[in-house]
Amino acid sequence: EEGWVAHEAQQVKSRKWSADHAKHLIRFRHQDLAMNDFGVGDSFPEMLLINCHNGLGSYQLRAGLYRMVCSNGMIIADAEYGSVKQRHIGFDADSVIQSSRQVIEDASTLSNVVSDWESISLTPEQSREYIKRAAEVRFGDNVDRNILANLNRSRRNEDMGDSMWKTFNRAQEGLMRGGFVNGTTNRNARAITNINTNLQINTDLWAMTSEFAQAVKN
């Protein structure tokens, strides 16, 4: 009734918890938040519903972005979305509905953030520094040239450019999809499929990018 439609679901495979009690992540799209209305070109907001693995009915609502060009989901981590990004609620329909409405209200603010990142052009030096910090979000100190090159690689024409937004998108997709060799460990970086790791990397990357963008502007 609120206009949200589930379009993707993910479940943690665990020997400890049954399927009913395992952690789930469900991504919802809203019929009123189309790309044209949102105004961020190839992306639009989503709502993520995450349950805790204890099976006690505790849930978490977070804001996300879905980028159509690469079918890739991002997770927002910004103080401006504190009322939505990590709200713990009981299994109560009214609480879920009220929180979901906040996602819609914050969509225009989120659009402004993305537009701001689109307007920031990075110098080659700034781009290298950002990619290094992005790599550290997943790999820590185990970062080599091959990782940096792959995180800054344009996988399609839409990814090309020196804006903060384009650079962020390249790094985010590379971190999540992997598919390259980590030269410091000689092991292949696999795609991220674990829900907790997905949340952590996306959250940390968004927060780091927000700080980096602010520093560049200053």
Model-derived features: positions:
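Intrinsically disordered, low-complexity regions enriched in serine/threonine
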Residues: K13-K16, R27-N218
